[in-house]
Amino acid sequence: MFSLQDLCRKNTFFLPSNFSKHTLHLLGLYWKGHGSIQRIKNDGVLIEHDLTLSINEALILAGEEGNNDIVQLLLLWEGNLHYAIIGALKTEKYSLVCEYHSQIQDWHVLLPLIQDPETFEKCHDLSLECDLSCLLQHAVKYNMLSILVKYKEDLLNVLFRQQIQGLFILACENRMFEILTWMGQNLPIPDPEPIFSIAVVTKDLEMFSLGYKIVFEYMENQGLFHLTQVVRMVMLNRHFSMVINKGLLPFVLEILKHGGNVNRALSYAVTQNKRKILDHVVRQKNVPHKTIERMLHLAVKKHAPRKTLNLLLSYINYKVKNVKKLLEHVVKYNSTLVIRILLEKKKNLLDATLTRYVKDSTYFRVREFIQEFSISPEKFIKIAVREQKNVLIKAICEDIWENPAERIRNLKQIVCTIKYESGRQFLINIIHTIYQSYSLKPEEVLKLATFYVKHNATTHFKDLCKYLWLNRGTESKKLFLECLEIADKKEFPDIKSIVSEYINYLFTAGAITKEEIMQVYALEYAMY
C-alpha cells in the first residue's frame, strides 16, 4: 500500500471517479471538506474532478485551513512553502506557521507575494529584529498604502518625520503613484525635488507631472509649502536644464504648462543644441523676431554648430535687424560661422565684421579672420587705416609681405586708392616707419622720395633728402631735379623749398648747371 500511495502522490494521472472516500484517504489524495485532489500538468491540481487551481493557490487555501497533510502533499508537487505560510497567517493558523518557521531565513521574502495588508503586517512582525520604520519601507515598496494610512499619526510624529523623505524617494523609485499622491496630500515632504530628478532619469512623464501636482497643489493646500514667484521660476529653470539636456520635449512642454519661461527654454535648447525642442517651442509659442535674434547671439557666443545657426536664421529669413549686436558677439567670442552662413545666403557682412574685428579684437583673431575668409590686404588695410590701427597694420603686413621693400611697394599702391587725405597721411606715416626700421636699396629709397613728393609728405621727404645727401651726395642730382619738376607742377611750395635748398648745394658743388635747373622751371629764377 505504501508503494501505491507513493506512486499516486508523486505522479500525474487521472483518478478514477468511482474511488471511494476511504480509498482516497488511504492513498493520501483526499482533502477534507473538498474531496479528491490530484495533480495535473506540472503546476496545477484538480479538486473533486471539478475545480482547477494552481499548486500555490491550493497551498494558500490549505494554509488558511491549517491542513498540514495537504500542505505536505502540495510541497511534494513542487509547491512554494511561502504560500502555505501566507494562508496560515491570514487565518492565524500559527501552529502551521511554527511547523515551518525554521525553514524561513528572511520573512521579507514573503512580502511581495502578499496582497492583504493585514497579512502583510503579520508576516513582517515575524522579523523580530525589524521595527516600524522597516515595515513602512516595505509597505511603500510593495504598494501597501493602507499600512501608511494606518500609521499616519506615527509618521507625523517628530521622531518619524525625518523618515518621510526616505519613504518619498522610495515611492518615486518604485513608481508608486497612489502612495506618492497620498503622501503629497497628507505628509510634510521636506524636499519634493527627487520626484523630478527620478522622473527625468527614468523618462517618466506621468511621475514628472505628478510632481508638479504635489508641489503646486497638494503641498500648498496643506499650508506646508509655498513658493514665491522667484523661487518657482528658479525651480522651473532648473528643470528646464535637466530635461532639455536629455532632449525630452514632452517634459519641456509640461514645464511650460506650469509657468516655465519660454525664453529660458529656448536658451537651454540653443546652448545644448537641441534643435527638435528649439523648433517646436519657436513654432508653438510664435516667438517674435527680436527674441530669435537674441537666441542667435547666444548661439554665436556658444559656438553653436551650423545646423543650429541655420535653424535660427531661417526663422527670420536670414534678415538680421540688429547687425551691430550680432557683430559684437561674433568678435567678442571669435565665432564667425554665422558670417559664413549669411555670406552663402548673399547676406554680406564681411566688411562690417572685419571692421568690428579691427576695432575691438586682437592681432591673432584679426589674422585668423582674414585667412578664414580670404580677405584682400587692401580691404583690411583700408579698414585698419580708418580705425587708426597702425600697430595692427604693421603686424599684419609683416605676415603678408615679409620683404620690407615689397611691403612698402604694396602700401604705396594702397595709398593711391585711399580717397581722404587723413587716411593717406596715416598710411604714409606707417610706410616711413618701415623705411626707418630697415635698410632699403638705393633705388627703393629714390622711388620712395618721389612718392613722398607726389603726396606732399613734406616732413618725410625732408628726412629722406638728408639721407640721400649724406649717403649719395651729388649722385642724387637727377632725383632732385625730378622732384623739383613734380613739386612745381603740383604747386607744393614746401616741397619746392626743400628741393631748392639741395639743388643750391649741388650748384655750389658744381654738380649741376644753371641751364639744367632752368629746364625744370617754367619761369626764370633770379637767384641763379
Swiss-Prot record:
Description of what induces expression: Expressed in the early phase of the viral replicative cycle.
Database matches in InterPro entries: MGF_505
First and last residues of every ANK repeat: 129-158, 261-290, 292-321, 322-352
Oligomer and partners: Interacts with host STING1. Interacts with host JAK1; this interaction leads to JAK1 degradation. Interacts with host JAK2; this interaction leads to JAK2 degradation. Interacts with host RELA; this interaction inhibits NF-kappa-B promoter activity.
Annotated GO CC locations: host cell cytoplasm
Location relative to the cell: Host cytoplasm
Swiss-Prot/TrEMBL keywords: ANK repeat, Early protein, Host cytoplasm, Host-virus interaction, Inhibition of host innate immune response by virus, Inhibition of host interferon signaling pathway by virus, Inhibition of host JAK1 by virus, Interferon antiviral system evasion, Repeat, Viral immunoevasion
Task performed by this protein: Plays a role in virus cell tropism, and may be required for efficient virus replication in macrophages. Interferes with host NF-kappa-B promoter activity mediated by TLR8. Mechanistically, inhibits the phosphorylation and subsequent nuclear translocation of host NF-kappa-B RELA subunit downstream of TLR8. Promotes the expression of the autophagy-related protein host ULK1 to degrade host STING and inhibit the interferon response. Also inhibits JAK1- and JAK2-mediated signaling and thus negatively regulates the IFN-gamma signaling.
Protein name, UniProt field: Protein MGF 505-7R
Taxonomic source organism: African swine fever virus (isolate Tick/South Africa/Pretoriuskop Pr4/1996) (ASFV)
GO BP field: symbiont-mediated suppression of host innate immune response; symbiont-mediated suppression of host JAK-STAT cascade via inhibition of JAK1 activity; symbiont-mediated suppression of host type I interferon-mediated signaling pathway
Similarity comment text for this entry: Belongs to the asfivirus MGF 505 family.
